[in-house]
């Protein structure tokens, strides 16, 4: 698969965050899809699929821990590279203070770090603390804009596929 990535462990990701503490003051409908009963992995999936800025931190563990979690998160949300694409391009398995400028201009990312300053700067929407086994949603995260109405009465409705097929000559439909 074009976005298949190397070494990672979905088992470690689920073991770390499968029973994580959710730390957030407010509920975000695009993240907390089941309200206060949202499973931590569902919140993480929702954050990744809606291109939030997700930061994995582990201050006292080896760098491999955050790298492994970032790569596993890419595989988790993208179906191991076979279903959804584009997550590998927005991933940075290990970031340092040198990367702050690039991260501050990026709309969504999946980043890992051991440096506490990156978490303190608040460049994240969702903070996944690998050692504390907690997921924190930023209080600065704004709610999503409302979706446009399903039926727009200003424009005439387009004919359905069934109507289009019925109006086509039989020779165009084939067997």
Residue ranges of predicted features:
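Residues within HEAT/ARM-like alpha-solenoid scaffolds
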Residues: 65-68, 72
């Amino acid at each position: 698969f074009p976005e298949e990535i190397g070494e990672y462990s979905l088992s470690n990701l689920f073991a770390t965050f499968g029973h994580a503490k959710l730390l957030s003051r407010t509920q975000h409908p695009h993240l907390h899809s089941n309200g206060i009963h949202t499973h931590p992995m569902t919140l993480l999936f929702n954050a990744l699929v809606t291109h939030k800025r997700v930061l994995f931190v582990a201050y006292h563990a080896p760098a491999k821990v955050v790298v492994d979690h970032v790569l596993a998160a890419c595989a988790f949300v993208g179906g191991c590279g076979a279903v959804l694409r584009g997550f590998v391009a927005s991933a940075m398995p290990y970031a340092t203070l040198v990367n702050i400028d690039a991260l501050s201009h990026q709309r969504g990312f999946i980043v890992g770090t051991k440096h506490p300053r990156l978490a303190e700067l608040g460049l994240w929407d969702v903070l996944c603390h690998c050692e504390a086994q907690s997921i924190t949603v930023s209080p600065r995260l704004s709610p999503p804009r409302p979706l446009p109405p399903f039926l727009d009465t200003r424009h005439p409705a387009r004919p359905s596929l069934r109507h289009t097929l019925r109006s086509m000559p039989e020779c165009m439909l084939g067997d």
